[in-house]
Amino acid sequence: KITPLKNEVLNTWKYFLKKIPKDCYLPNPLWAMEFGATYPFKETTPHALGTRKLKKFKGKFGINLRKFTKNQIFSNVPAYARLKVKKFPNWKVNMIMNSRKFYKNNKTSVDKILESIINLKQESYQKLEWNCRGEKYNLIKKIVTFRGSGVRIKRNGQIPTLISTCMAQTPYLPWKKRYIAFEECLKIQGFDK
């Protein structure tokens, strides 16, 4: 059975998918902490910029960094952006850019659910990996995995490999309201014989 917290996470993203325009492009992954953020990320990083200059920007979910002390500023920037590096790798720049662009293009729809996403607290629950390109934005007949990298949604019938199916990442079947049994996973992957 799913925990109340994971049920809240699932319901939040289910509602999010219901609220966004059906024809919009959903980047994969979607990092919701970038909704409203303005801190620099293309040519520099928050760490390289320093707290004095960083105060001029907005952190995760558009939080104004000006109101925070030097020690509080970095806790209001997403964890993945706190790295002590001068420049982010291109893949990270693209993910941040795509998430911010999605928010800019869909702000009216996203703002209807944003507070619920913010209330999820744990950053991994504030990231959505939609691996169902071209399908309707609906969670019910999909396979959900709660991962450190985010809430991963896959097509029904696409089960993660056994290697990645540790206890913390067991696939959840929303339409059956239960986790997949280990034996089912073995059978799907042809190891039941």
Language model region names:
Residues 4-7, 11, 192:
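C-terminal peripheral helix-coil segments that are non-catalytic and often amphipathic
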Residues 20-193:
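C-terminal target-recognition/interaction regions appended to catalytic cores
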